[in-house]
Amino acid sequence: MFGFFKRKALKKRAFNLYKELVFGRLYEGNRFGLNAEDLCKTTGLNLFSILNLIHRLIATGLVEEYELVDVVCYRAVKEPIYLDDTSPPSIITDYVKRAIGRVDFKGLA
């Protein structure tokens, strides 16, 4: 039973993390990304937990890892073509909810 609540909390943090990456990608451009320390500050998770979460999102194809000036950063990938910088925030948030809803967090909680 407690595993359910842990997965629910993890899903909420993954939602916040992915939402920030998607908004950044749409509004800041293709080179926008955050490193692990920035993601720790965003979600409130420790470094070990954030790396596990990011690798789960990488495995599902929502996030990619790239190197920017010798720093490993992460950015959102495969946003639908109907999302751009003129899209209302509610449409972007709905996409993020659907995308995170398809991710299985069972082994992480």
Located regions from the model:
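Short amphipathic alpha-helical interaction segments
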Residues: 44-59
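Small side chains
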Residues: 14, 33-36, 54, 76
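Short acidic, hydrophobic short linear motifs in intrinsically disordered regions
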Residues: 28-42
